[in-house]
Amino acid sequence: MSHTSQFTLLGKRRFLPFFITQSLGAFNDNLFKQSLILAILFKLSLGDGDRSIWVNLCALLFILPFFLFSALGGQFGEKFAKDALIRAIKLAEIGIMAIGALGFITNHLALMLVALFGMGTHSALFGPVKYSILPQALREEELVGGNGLVEMGTFLAILAGTIGAGVMMSSASYATAVAGGVVGTAVLGYLASRWIPRAAAVSPQMRLDWNIFKQSWAILRMGLGQTPAVSRSIVGNSWFWFVGAIYLTQIPAYAKDWLHGDGTVVTLVLTLFSVGIALGSLLCERLSGRKVEIGLVPFGSFGLTLFGLLWWWHSGDVPAAALPHDWLALLGMSQAWWILVSIVGLGVFGGFYIVPLYALIQARTAEDQRARVIAANNILNALFMVVSAILTIVLLGLAELTIPQLFLVVSLLNIAVNAYIFRIVPEFTMRFLIWLLSHSMYRVEHRDLERIPDEGAALLVCNHVSFVDALLLGGAIRRPIRFVMYYKIYNLPVLNFVFRTAGAIPIAGRGEDEAIYERAFARIAEYLAAGELVCIFPEGKLTGDGEIDVFKGGVNRILSETPVPVIPLALQGLWGSFFSRDPGKGFFKRLWSRVTIVAGAAIPVEAAQPDALREQVSRLRGDLR
């Protein structure tokens, strides 16, 4: 459980060449697509009434391959070595961009459209391998940081491609500039891909099914047939792209009609939104404690709604002028700042929302299904984006809503969709409550938690100071833990939801309720036999004076039935807090106090006697109660 910064990945060959390759791909997608749209709108000789039709055709041609070829991309990602597959896709990109370059140089719209469809196909085939290679290249504790960097790179590349297209298309020799830019970027992407280390095929024996319609349906069913946490994460991921597509497509018109701005204002808003997502994606690693922390998803969802509502509420505050505002003039208006802050906030919380979802899908999907499940995610993403376009047409055209009112509808829909997801998968809410507690009421620090094994069974033993010990431990330790706790604590209102969802084990004294007592030991043995972590509080009760009480003999029974390593833990700084039994406690007395979790070296079964364990835990805790 090493705790290195996500930025160290940029210095490692197992990540950096892939990061450069995927970022250049996202950049080139948007450089070419946006250049083509600008050419249709301002450069090519077309009937004025036809231009909007051609622009909409561009959107269709780019997204159609995700429906047609994502299933093939999923199969390819499992049958072939991922490094070789990426190189083949990037080599094809050079040919596709050569066709597009020829189209620009000759003003041949048909060639440009063929190239656009080709780039959509390139992205549809690249998507499954893009996300399924990460768990092969990264350790589990690096997965959130790696996904954060990928999302940051993707959205900044999208922004750079969009801006780059505008710069190139404004030059007199735009055709040459675009042609050289897209082909040159494709070549650089291929060269970067040659440095990606070997990523072996996970199912080389797979027989490819070339029936794209049959396979698309089968893969979509596979994705949505995963565990509820994975399948609803796929839905949540697609919902993010639904929301993002609406905001991104409306930004140009919003900047013109509601911010009364020129083209520089459009660029400013796009920049703020993209930088916000990049920032939120990067912050995920720090906020999650370098583990797959799905508790950030409800937090991100809350922010998406809050800042969407703020954006709607403050729209209309910016006054019009004789000439459109440029970006500097807009920044000088106090009325615009709430809108701009809302846009950044949307991006930041969007990053909090999407990165943990991607990481969960990767971490909890079987290796031999991962690429196909991600392909299913891409198919659903495309479907949600098409539905978002249809909904936008209906609400803005038929219902005659304004753009801010559309943002209001999206913000309210976000509440409904995520309430459904969190109801089906209460683990999201449970992890959010744990995350909120450990990041709001306390400043939780930890030492030597790398002593807890990354995999395999172990028994954790810890002193028992407060009603929230299990929540704090669960929030700090990367692996899921099954806690054994006194049944009356387990049944506490609100907390019972958290404990039950986490699979905690209620226990009573043998003389108090023998059925609960025996059932608890049976479940402990079951969890340990399955290779999970189980945590017990051997005192059997909360401390009444802050000191560590006698450890009871239940640990002997556990280890006799299922011999596993024992890891001693100690909680420091919780005594006197609101959730302890200190008579002098108060809600604000130790609010935001420093709490430390310390792990000791593993103790072999034969040495794990109650008195010896108590001595180890006492030594770890020291004098800090």
Regions found by a protein language model. Give the residues of each.
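Transmembrane alpha-helix termini and helix-breaking/packing motifs in multi-pass membrane transporters
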Residues: S35-L46, G100-T106, L159-V182, D257-W258, ...
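Helix-loop junctions on the cytosolic side of multi-pass membrane transporters
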Residues: S132, Q136-A137, V182-D209, S315-V318, ...
